[in-house]
């Protein structure tokens, strides 16, 4: 927690992790080719004069097309025993470095069995992929049409050549105590990335707000 500026100094000095617990957590990962038909509208802004004032007007145009993308290692967590946002904070993993399972790899560590099945996991993966495809298509439209806005975007995606892998990924779990409250954190056993909650120093937050908030003079100057 040394890098957490808002964390109280005393917490940094007194925080001592309890025994680390090493565990292999279950994940599904999916590869697929996608083909997405899309249609929507893009807008271009222009400035017009209305009397003594200038106004921005947006002209809207229809657009449609097909977007293709290959999805590689879309990761879905298959455990329900841990805080999901904390687990997401550990990503990404270097899934391209996975190895075929051997009992000796997990010897001495706990290994959880999946709680999210393959079918459910693929639906979750598709929701995540859909979000990424929407962002990519919006960016494509803005670039190709030199557009300022995109709206009413509708997607229809087909998946083919879908493959999956079942992975056990290494995580270290621990916690520390500060002012009678226990704070849990996790460490990505592959990359060392840390995820978890830390206490907040209210005085530090106030100082930050005072330094970043505009002064009355700033408000007056901006009018």
What are these regions (language model features)?
Residues 198-207:
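Juxtamembrane/start-of-transmembrane alpha-helix segments at the extracytoplasmic/lumenal side
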Residues 169-195:
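Extended, hydrophilic extramembrane loops/domains of integral membrane proteins
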Residues 37-39, 181-182, 193, 203-204:
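Flexible loop/turn segments at secondary-structure boundaries
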Residues 1-177:
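Charged, low-complexity helical/coil segments in non-catalytic cytosolic or luminal regions
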Residues 211-217:
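Conserved small/polar residues in nucleotide/adenosyl-binding loops
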């Amino acid at each position: 927690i040394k890098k957490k500026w808002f964390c109280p100094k005393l917490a940094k000095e007194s925080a001592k992790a309890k025994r680390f617990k090493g565990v292999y957590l279950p994940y599904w990962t999916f590869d697929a080719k996608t083909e997405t038909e899309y249609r929507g509208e893009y807008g271009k802004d222009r400035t017009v004069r209305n009397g003594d004032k200038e106004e921005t007007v947006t002209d809207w145009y229809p657009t449609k097309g097909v977007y293709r993308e290959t999805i590689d290692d879309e990761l879905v967590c298959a455990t329900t025993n841990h805080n999901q946002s904390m687990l997401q904070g550990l990503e990404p993993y270097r899934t391209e470095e996975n190895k075929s399972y051997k009992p000796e790899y997990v010897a001495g560590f706990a290994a959880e069995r999946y709680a999210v099945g393959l079918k459910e996991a693929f639906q979750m993966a598709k929701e995540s992929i859909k979000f990424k495809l929407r962002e990519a298509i919006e960016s494509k439209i803005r670039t190709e049409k030199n557009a300022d806005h995109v709206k009413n975007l509708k997607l229809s995606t087909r998946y083919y050549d879908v493959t999956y892998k079942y992975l056990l990924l290494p995580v270290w779990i621990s916690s520390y105590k500060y002012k009678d409250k226990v704070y849990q954190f996790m460490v990505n056993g592959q990359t060392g990335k840390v995820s978890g909650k830390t206490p907040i120093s209210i005085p530090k937050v106030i100082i930050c707000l005072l330094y970043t908030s505009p002064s009355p003079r700033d408000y007056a100057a901006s009018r």
